[in-house]
A protein has these predicted regions:
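Thiamine diphosphate
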Residues: 1-161, 180, 189-322, 326, 336-535, 539, ...
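Glycine-rich, charged/polar anion/phosphate-binding loops
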Residues: 174-177, 236-243, 367-369, 467, ...
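Short glycine/serine/threonine-rich phosphate/pyrophosphate-binding segments
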Residues: 55-56, 129-133, 169-177, 199-200, ...
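A short alpha/beta connector and helix-capping loop motif
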Residues: 171-192, 462, 466, 471, ...
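Active-site glycine- and acidic-residue-rich loops that bind
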Residues: 167-172, 229-238, 516-523, 639-640
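Terminal amphipathic helices with adjacent charged low-complexity linkers/tails
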Residues: 311, 315-353
Length: 699
């Protein structure tokens, strides 16, 4: 039997191992305490990190809290403790307390996030944290070379830690993140915790081999496999892997086999799908028991010491639970706090136009505004498919591309490859990396080439970007601008280059949506978009890029348009038309045709909303209460188009003023065809607007 330990003579690595062993016991006691509280209906969900303790704590010794950046997943409880999250703070989240520092009671347990620790607020989406982690690592490179950037901090040798279960390796976003990390030589530690299951799905049912075998030979990626149940092995291999990253040698995938002695969560019963002998084997290979035996064998502890530490940590967790249970719960009214923060400033009115000022197209106004804003703010980076001019090695020999519509032409040449660059053809990659950059204080401007191809980025837009402020209770923000070419009227655009769908994103809390129709508004709204600290979907109608009718002089630099403020295109007192995007001009044409027929002012008021989220309810209500009639015109399909929301609002807020039913004109529930007559039959035409206005006025 080993002699009783004498802390004074234990060497430093063993002393650290004892301290970490204490944290491992705290982690396990927290799981057990939450399970007890869940069974007592005092917490409402429980998911454990049991079996993963040695992995998290073995790595933590080489990681640096509040220095490195962390994108953990829900089994990283032991790591979070090592980084500085306290047992009380974890239990505050479990009970849903107002003082929960991660989310103020908004998120499930084990969804940590503390800005002061660089511990990024996480979502429940498996694997979706990988792409923001890549963006964070990119930001480290960028910021460390520009230490003067306001609100941005980097040390030069920090790394980004991102973890996931083996099951999440089936997600495409994981593979996209590996590809980019390896190609860009980024300082990322990918930790894959393999407990053999994704809830009830065996790893062998998902992949032909463990992930460390599948990526062996992946160029630019070091691959490490370790027994994650053994703290000392993890600590040794982890130290080497992390040192590899810190010296700039590139990313590491760290694959660790671990156990899952408890079910996936308390909503699961693993005895339904795991045989008894398998669970017995896991119990025999419990990392905490192995750790205790190793410490005893090395003379760091005696069995009595292990029992004493177990009792002490149990009492510590029990006391923390009492504090959490006695903490106040959130005020239900606070559920509307921290959804989004719209910059608040006065409508600037008409811009002052310099005599003989150059008049530019809608597309050129956007291009020049991007150039202007990039010159002002070095935090802005523009990236996406084909946005760069050309490969730097041939830039002096060619004219340059600058986007399929030329909107980013010249930005790379003016500001360099670090600030305007091409990405893989992967929309989730584009947006997800932007999320990570934004979390680090940069002002990323991502481009989605066509709205029709935005769908692979839906999870990053709606779950990672849009929820950032709310899920962290205001601790984190995501100042990301996503420019998207949208809409039809192209003649030949066909199905996948012609559609709109702004109403889908209007349904997502946390996203701001701009949809300008003329050059000056595009400039004013884009300036405001860069001033926002929340994600902005900046919709640019392709048909409007080079038209003559919506050209304007570039407004003065200080001319910014507030979101949520529409504008009167025409004035009238007989009917109101609400519209946006490319249908604004078609509505003007329709009113012009009606006026030409009668040689009089037909009294129709056209309102251009300019932004969809938020949208200007006041201007609509004021107009409809004066005119008594409302027609809403949009390019999107009629069913569930954004016009339905406006119609519902008008019926509610203006019912007693209405002299006729609210009318809507949009695309039928079909797709845009290639042959021009098919497109004309789908998208609202001037003749359709004239027809509906006549009927509305005659009602």
């Amino acid at each position: 039997m080993a002699a009783k330990s004498n802390p004074a003579v234990i060497d430093e690595p063993l002393a650290r191992a004892v301290a970490d062993f204490r944290l491992a016991l705290i982690s396990r006691h927290l799981d057990d305490r939450e399970i007890t509280l869940r069974n007592q209906s005092k917490v409402f969900f429980q998911i454990s990190g049991a079996g993963h303790e040695a992995l998290g704590l073995g790595l933590a010794r080489s990681l640096r809290p509040a220095y490195d950046w962390f994108f953990p997943y829900y089994r990283d409880r032991a790591l979070a403790l090592a980084l500085g999250v306290t047992p009380t703070e974890m239990l505050l989240q479990a009970v849903g307390a107002a003082d929960d520092p991660a989310s103020g009671g908004r998120q499930m347990p084990c969804h940590w996030g503390q800005r002061e620790l660089n511990l990024v607020s996480q979502t429940s989406c498996t694997g979706s944290q990988c792409l923001p982690a890549i963006g964070s690592a990119e930001a480290s490179h960028y910021i460390s070379r520009r230490p003067h950037l306001h609100g941005c901090h980097a040390h030069g040798d920090e790394l980004t830690y991102v973890s996931l279960g083996e099951g999440a390796c089936s997600e495409g976003e994981f593979w996209e993140s590996l590809n980019t990390a390896a190609r860009l030589h980024l300082p990322v530690l990918f930790v894959v915790a393999d407990n053999g299951y994704a809830i009830s799905v065996r790893a062998s049912d998902q992949s032909p081999a463990p992930i460390h075998e599948m990526v062996r030979g992946f160029r630019g990626l070091q691959v490490v496999h370790v027994d994650g149940r053994d703290y000392f092995k993890v600590r040794a291999k982890g130290a080497d892997a992390i040192a590899h990253i810190r010296i700039g040698a590139g990313p590491v995938l760290f694959h660790a086999t671990v156990t899952r002695p408890y079910a996936h969560s308390l909503s699961d019963d693993q005895k339904k799908y795991r045989p008894a002998d398998e669970l017995e084997d896991e119990e025999q290979h419990d990392p905490i028991e192995l750790w205790a035996r190793q410490l005893i064998r090395r003379g760091a502890l005696h069995r009595d010491d292990v029992d004493r530490i177990r009792d002490e940590t149990f009492a510590e967790v029990r006391a923390a639970a009492e504090v959490a249970l006695g903490s106040p719960r959130p005020d239900p009214r606070s559920v509307l706090d921290h959804v989004v923060a719209v910059p608040d400033f006065e409508d600037p009115g008409e811009p002052v136009v310099v005599p003989d000022a150059e008049v530019v197209t809608f597309g050129e106004a956007i291009r020049r505004t991007l150039h202007e804003q990039m010159a002002i703010d070095e935090r802005i980076r523009v990236f996406g498919e084909d946005v760069a001019d050309a490969d730097p090695t041939v830039l002096d020999e060619v004219a340059g591309k600058g986007g399929v519509f030329g909107i980013t032409f010249g930005l790379q040449r003016a500001f360099g490859q670090a600030r305007c660059f091409n990405t893989p053809l992967a929309e989730a990659n584009i947006v997800g990396r932007g999320v990570g950059m934004a979390l680090r204080g940069l002002k990323p401007c991502a481009e989605i080439q066509f709205f029709d191809y935005i769908w692979p980025a839906m999870q990053q837009l709606t779950q990672e970007a849009a929820t950032t402020r709310w899920r962290s209770n205001g601790s984190f923000t995501c100042p990301l601008v996503v420019r998207v070419a949208i809409g039809g009227y192209l003649t030949g655009g066909s199905i996948w280059h012609s559609h709109s769908g702004e109403s889908i994103f209007a349904h997502v809390p946390g996203i701001l949506i701009a949809f300008p129709s003329r050059a000056r508004d595009a400039a004013g709204l884009l300036r405001t978009a860069f001033a926002c600290n929340d994600p902005v979907l900046f919709l640019e109608h392709k048909h409007l890029y080079r038209q003559g009718y919506n050209r304007d002089p570039i407004p003065p630099l200080d001319w910014r348009l507030p979101f949520g403020r529409g504008v009167h295109v025409t004035r009238g007192d007989r009917a109101t038309v609400v519209t946006w995007g490319a249908t604004v001009h078609r509505c003007k044409q329709a009113v012009g045709e009606l006026a030409a027929e009668t040689s009089t002012d037909v009294g129709i008021e056209i309102i251009d909303l300019r932004t969809i989220a938020p949208w200007d309810r006041d201007i609509v209500a004021d107009s409809v209460r004066r005119t008594g009639r409302l027609l809403i015109v949009h390019e999107d399909t009629l069913t569930c188009g954004f016009g339905a929301e406006i119609a519902a609002f008008a019926a509610d807020a203006c019912f007693e003023y209405l002299a006729a039913p609210v009318w809507r004109l949009g695309a039928p529930d079909t797709l845009v065809g290639y042959e021009p007559s098919l497109e004309d039959a789908t998208l609202p035409q001037v003749v359709d607007i004239v027809r509906d206005l006549r009927a509305l006025l005659a009602y």
